[in-house]
Amino acid sequence: PFEVPPAWFAVVHPGIGVPTAGVFQAPELTRNSPPATIRGSLPAGWTSQPLPGRNDLEPVVRARHPEVAAALERLGRHGEARLTGSGACVYAAFADERAAARAAADVAAGWQGWAVAGLARSPLLARLERERRSRAGGAEG
């Protein structure tokens, strides 16, 4: 485990869906990216800015879906905008809730925007650990 600094995110949905299969089947998709690890891509003292890594799906989605490209550009006015997975949502990291909320509110008609707090720990992992402890405690009694 490693510490993840607190961060706020603006998440914007541009009102369309992006078929994941089509993105992964795209002939223009880069398929020879070097492997990366989360720990290896976080520089010492990282504070959520700039975001580490890259998303090889982003150029494909940007080229095929103008709405996503527009959302990336618009959110990019406020911070470093990135594609979530294969889309269609885009996001940017911010140091505080106010900046994230301001960016999330700057959406075009038909889009949705949210300001959300980043999580330092997966809720699913925490639940699995609680259940494991509970089962282990019950087995001893």
Feature map (PLM): residue ranges:
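Conserved, helical-rich catalytic subdomain that frames metal- and/or nucleotide-binding sites
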Residues: P1-E80, A95-G141
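Short beta-strand->loop micro-motif that forms the acidic, two-metal-ion catalytic signature
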Residues: C89-A95
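Glycine-rich beta-strand-to-loop/alpha-helix junction loops that act as flexible
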Residues: T84-A88
